[in-house]
Amino acid sequence: MNKWYPKNGYVIFHVDMNSFYASVEIADNPELKGKPVAIAGNPDERKGIIVTCSYEARAYGVKTTMSLWEARKLCPSLVVLRPNFPRYREVSQEIFKLLETYTPYVEPVSIDEAFMDITTCSHLGSPIELAVSIQNKLLEQMNLPCSIGIAPNKFLAKMGSDMKKPNGITILRKRDIYSKLWPLPIEEMYGVGKKSAAKLRKHVINNIGDIAKADSQLLKTLLGVNGEKLKSRALGNDPRPVDPEQAESFKSIGSSTTFPKDIVDYEELIIKLNDLAQNVATRLERKDAVGDTVQLMIRYYDRKTITRRMKLSTYIYSKDDIFYYSEMLLNQHWNGAAIRLLGITIQDAKKKEDVTYQLSLF
């Protein structure tokens, strides 16, 4: 069995749950099985946005981020449900606990995906046998499908898990990158967003192989440090270890300030709030992180303190976005009394390259 496990190197899994929100709803309500199901921000409004949908819905052409009215036009029988984030988080924790029965080296990177280092798991079987076992247990115990990428590093494992959906298993070795990875368009590369892709295409860098062959200085000029990183990844390299503690260190990133004098003037509070948003954005940038929960803390003149949070349907990191949602929370929950302290925290933060961006529902 050790022939599957290198003496020098790693065997990494990327476990990616398929259509997670929709799959949870179907698992909880078996009557939905086989039906086109979509999760949308506000099913009662035509302008709602599809957050995710089942593969039955995708067969009609329904896609994530599509407007609800357009989705219903394509699929009149579409079953549309509101997102139940507390339930999704609960199921997510159950999934990660199941993965930890195989190895303690499990690194959750979002609510529905995780890396696993199974290098020391040769006693449990071959990597393929372990992947099949994980898929079977998730289906038998939770009725949830997943795709698994198997590779020598995190980047290749992530790319592999995207290649066969739903419920697929893909092995992506370094020697496979020329035939399996390089022909893919740059938009499919883990870590390349829409803005980066547009810059690259202007320089006739159209697929992952082009990134691998591109001049390093050009990539650095176009994309900064991330350009160098992308070239290394396109060549099949990724030194990052699977770190179970990584999720803990990124749980919350925030900034707060106690005013020398209590503030009751709204315009003055907005200036302070803007400064805090800038501080948080700077800290997120330093950690190359994003988050999908904004929390505002207000401490009044009499030391009474409230904290209010807003769960978003997309990850944010910019000062403008942080300020926008923080101001919304302030307007909703400030009682008009003098404020002594304000604080903004981004919770559920993740590494920017480890999340899948979704269009905001708002």
Predicted feature descriptions by range:
Residues M1-L222, N226-E228, K352-D354, L359-F362:
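Gly/Gly-Pro- and Ser/Thr-rich, intrinsically disordered tail segments characteristic of DNA damage-repair
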Residues Y5-K7, H14, E188, A198-L341, ...:
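DNA-contacting surface of Y-family translesion DNA polymerases
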Residues E113, L341-G343:
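Extracellular/lumenal ectodomain signal focusing on beta-strand-rich modules
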